[in-house]
C-alpha cells in the first residue's frame, strides 16, 4: 500500500491536533465536578463513563496523522492504568500540557533534543519531590478516603475499606454484578495465583479479556500435557457432565493446546488452561494447596499417577473461577473444611520453624491465599448503563487504594504537583539553553491538572493556580466545596504511585512526540478504487 509522508512542522502539528482532540474529550472528566462522556457501542446501550483510559481507548480519528497523535496519548493512559490502575485522566492532561508548550518552543527554533533532556531531568526531580512529601497508609480511614476520592463517592470508599479490612491489604478483591440495586461486600473463601490463560481464545468476556467459569471441574497436575490422548477420557467424562474445566498443568504443548482451543471455539466444551504457579518445590506445595481448596488430587509422577488413568473423582471443583491474562482466582472451592484447616495449621507451623525471611514471606503469601479468602464487591444499579459506570468507578477506586498501600499518598486535587514545582528550581538553575526550556515546560505543565479541575468547576483556572501558590504546602483547592483547605486533613488525597506514574508516562511520550521529525501513514484509498466484483462467465448455454 502507498504511504503518505509528513515532515517537521507539518508532522508535529498534525499529531498535535490528534493529541488535542483526545485530551479535550478526556479532560472534561477530571475533578469532583468533572462531566461524563457517552461512548457508542457496536451493540447494546451506550456506555456512560468518566474513566480516562476507557474513553481514550474508544477514540479512533479519521485522519491517519491525527490518529497517531491520539493513540500515543491513549498509550500514556493505558500505561498509567497498567502500572497504577488509576490517574489516566491526570496523565492525559499532563501530556497535552507538555506537548502543547513544547511544540511552541520547537516551532520557534528550539532544539527538541535539548528540550527532551530538560523534560527528563525535571521529571526525575519532581518524582523525588513527590516521594519526599508522601504519607504512609496507616488506618482504615486512610483507605476509605483514597477510595472515596477516586470513585467520587464516599459509600464506595467505605465499601472498599471494609473489603480490605476483611481480607488484608494484600488480599484478593473481585467485583461482580449484584442481582439487586444495592452494592455490598461479601467474603468468600478463595485463592488467587499469578498465572493467566494460555490462549486468548479461551476468554468468555471480550470486553475485560477474561474467562469466567461457573461451577467448573479443576484438573491439577505437575506434568506437561503434549498429547491430547492423555486427557481424552477425562475430557469425555467432563463433557458428559456438561460442566466447564480448568486445567492447571506444568505446560500444555504440541497439538494438545490447539486441540483444546479449537474445541472451545466450536463450543464442544468450555475449557481454560493455565500454567501451574511457582517453581520447583514451591510449585508442588502450591498445587497441593489448590488441591486441598478444591477437593481434588494432584496428578503427579511422585505419587506414581498417570494422566490417562485419571478419573473424574480426582478432579477438584469450585463455585467460580476467573482467569485474566495474568492471574487466576478460584472462589469457593469444594474442598473439605477440616482438610483446609489442617493445611493452614501446617503452613503456620512451617512459618514458625523457618529461619529464612524469604521462605517466611512466601509461606505467609500461601497462608493468606488459603485462609484469607476473597472479598467480592457485588455492584448493584437500577439500569445496565448505570451498572457499567459504577463498576468502572469501583475498579478505579480499588486500584488507587492498592497503589496507596504500596507507596503512600500525597495531597490530592493536583495540589502535590503544584507543591513539587519548587523542587525543580535547583535543577533549572544548573541548566542552560533548551534544557532549561524543557524544565520550564514541565513546571508549567504541573499546574495543568489543578487548572482543569477548576475549569470543570466553572472557575478561571489561572486564578485558582495563582492563589494555590500563595498557600502553604499541603493546602489545595477543594472543588467539591469551592474552598481552599488542608487536603490531607480534609481526606482529599491521591496515591503517590498514581501521581508519579501519570507524570513519568506523560513526560516519556511527550518527549518522543517533540523529537518526531517525520511521520509515515497509509495513503487513504479513493472511494472509487474499491475492487469490482468479477462478473461470472460461461453462462451462454442457459435458456
Curated annotation (Swiss-Prot):
GO terms for molecular function: ATP binding; ATP-dependent protein folding chaperone; isomerase activity; unfolded protein binding. It is found in: Cytoplasm. Forms a cylinder of 14 subunits composed of two heptameric rings stacked back-to-back. Interacts with the co-chaperonin GroES. The gene is groEL. GO terms for biological process: protein refolding. InterPro entries: Chaperonin_Cpn60_CS, Cpn60/GroEL, Cpn60/GroEL/TCP-1, GroEL-like_apical_dom_sf, GROEL-like_equatorial_sf, TCP-1-like_intermed_sf. This is Chaperonin GroEL. Together with its co-chaperonin GroES, plays an essential role in assisting protein folding. The GroEL-GroES system forms a nano-cage that allows encapsulation of the non-native substrate proteins and provides a physical environment optimized to promote and accelerate protein folding. It comes from Limosilactobacillus fermentum (strain NBRC 3956 / LMG 18251) (Lactobacillus fermentum). The keyword Isomerase applies. Its main location: cytoplasm.
